Amino acid sequence: MLFRSRKLRLHGGAKQYHHDVVGTNSRLDSMQAAVLLAKLPYLATWSERRREHAATYSNALADVSEVRTPVVDACNEPIFHQYTLRVERRDDLQAHLKSKGVGNAVYYPVPLHLQNCFSDLGYKRGRLPEAERAAGEVISLPIYPELTRDQVDYVADMIRGFYR
């Protein structure tokens, strides 16, 4: 019972990005709520900084054919909690960025239809090829508001250099 409860509270899995049951992220306690309340006045400024960083990345990487940047519809104003690219040779790029001191992450490396918690739906590998392809191509770049323009430019330069 304890193991199942822990899984339910951690998105449904004991291991990150591998879900055995459908769960939630329900770890907000009073202390975290107080901290978030204190940060709320800064949210608009932080969101604008993230949008600026995203625009810088997108502009710098626009002519790199191996990189697909996020598509932003003109009527939307994303916050860019993550800035996720789809790239060729993702694992090699990830290692390259790490070797250059650039943090990066692969969120959701296993598509939903291949998670254990959805196995009863009967989807097999190959059934949703675009989702599987995306899971193998996505990489997220640093996007936190405190980044400097020089740091964002450095990350973009490291990616451009990798694909030359």
What is the role of each PLM region?
Residues 3-164:
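PLP-dependent aminotransferase class I/II
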